[in-house]
Amino acid sequence: MNAAVIDSKNSQDFIVADMSLADWGRKELNIAETEMPGLVQTREEYKVQQPLKGARIAGSLHMTIQTGVLIETLTALGADVRWASCNIFSTQDHAAAAIAKAGTPVFAFKGESLDEYWEFSHRIFEWPNGEFANMILDDGGDATLLLILGSKAEKDRSVISKPTNEEEVALYKSIERHLDADPTWYSTRLAHIKGVTEETTTGVHRLYQMEKEGRLPFPAINVNDSVTKSKFDNLYGCRESLVDGIKRATDVMIAGKIAVVAGYGDVGKGCAQSLRGLGATVWVTEIDPICALQAAMEGYRVVTMEYAADKADIFVTATGNYHVIGHDHMKAMRHNAIVCNIGHFDSEIDVASTRQYQWDNIKPQVDHIIFPDGKRVILLAEGRLVNLGCATGHPSFVMSNSFTNQTLAQIELFTQGNKYENKVYVLPKHLDEKVARLHLARIGANLTVLSDEQAGYIGVDKNGPFKPNHYRY
């Protein structure tokens, strides 16, 4: 690792791959804005009010072009921001350079080591002039985890003494290093946090678990379960970005192949649609009888991974779970089977068990795992997010939905935080509908307006909300 990274000091308050890429990044940011009407209109609505003035946001989310538009929306509304990526492969280096050149400290480049990743996660909490972050914007929960676990380790270092995987080895080492330098580094920073807004399913699971156990130290807004996030980003975003990643990585013809999608939630639904749309025969694995029935009713064959392992050509995990594809599954696969993950963490595929075999790196984020019999399994992005590791993630338009929710959630927690207990909340229905409304004109959609009589007949305000909270879209 670069020495400047180890000691957390740098002559400039950013670490990116190549600042000469900044002008290219700026051009793409300008293009992305034309596809992100929610963020652009939110800037316009709040630019005078400056609701985030005084907010110091520690951001941990994929450093893409679309995230750059989010960052510049937050700063336009008054926030100071420091940023790291939440995945070692997901940064778009020209985006990071453009944002750093504009003055926001960014610590991210594509292909970070795990040591660098966790060091950069610390850097977003290291503010100049004796100040501290007071808000977290998280994706996957790593920034939140870092402060909470570090605070526990201040009292008892045994909690970081037994790593179970290479990720924890790097995390625990980074915490040890910071505690040696400052025994109260984490609790000092944790005490200043007013709240967190969480982007994705995996991070939300962590928050709900902490709430259930009474360990959540500040209020949290679950952005993932806003309808305009989960039913759009997770579904339509994955429907476009999954096959983009697979095809950029492998140039494989998807038509005629058997593709297995593990998990039929919103992400899995989008993945299955895209693979079928390109002519694959799609099988689905599921643990939930409701999701399994949905898949079957859509015409997908519902099977087990044990059944599919030696028959399919392409495997995609979309569960948020652990070792959904294990060593024995990969050992049984056909020669040149493609294995990838679109869930947040790399634990869905048991990659560690294959390190005993020879790996042949074909190009960045594409590896052949060579089994003793000579068979090769093609692993994409080392089991991390294939759409961001091997492509550029979701399109700008759908990310405008998600990031408008993030912006509104940051405003809500920062300005109204005293109304919230240390629990997990979702944005109210009227804001969900507002986010959708902001995006209609861009795609030529025109709403029908209820008459007073019609609104009275179904018992809603003619301006919304139009559905009860329990409604399933």
Swiss-Prot record:
Listed cofactors: NAD(+)
One annotated Gene Ontology cellular component of this protein: cytosol
UniProt keyword list: Cytoplasm, Hydrolase, NAD, One-carbon metabolism
Enzyme class, broadest EC rank: hydrolase
GO BP terms in the entry: L-homocysteine biosynthetic process; one-carbon metabolic process; S-adenosylmethionine cycle
An example molecular function term from Gene Ontology annotations: adenosylhomocysteinase activity
Residues the entry annotates as binding substrate: T64, D139, E199, K229, D233
Domain of life: Bacteria
Known pathway: Amino-acid biosynthesis; L-homocysteine biosynthesis; L-homocysteine from S-adenosyl-L-homocysteine: step 1/1
EC number of the protein: 3.13.2.1
Name of one Pfam family that matches: AdoHcyase_NAD
Binding site for NAD(+): 200-202, 234, 263-268, 286, 321, 342-344, 387
Subcellular location as annotated: Cytoplasm
Entry-linked PROSITE patterns: ADOHCYASE_1, ADOHCYASE_2
InterPro entries: Adenosylhomocyst_ase-like_sf, Adenosylhomocysteinase-like, Ado_hCys_hydrolase_NAD-bd, NAD(P)-bd_dom_sf, S-Ado-L-homoCys_hydrolase_CS
CDD domains: SAHH
Catalytic activity of the protein: S-adenosyl-L-homocysteine + H2O = L-homocysteine + adenosine
Free-text comment on the cofactor: Binds 1 NAD(+) per subunit.
Homology family: Belongs to the adenosylhomocysteinase family.
Entry-linked HAMAP family: AdoHcyase (MF_00563)
Primary role: May play a key role in the regulation of the intracellular concentration of adenosylhomocysteine.
Protein name from the UniProt record: Adenosylhomocysteinase
Organism per entry: Paraburkholderia xenovorans (strain LB400)
Lineage summary: Bacteria, Pseudomonadati, Pseudomonadota, Betaproteobacteria, Burkholderiales
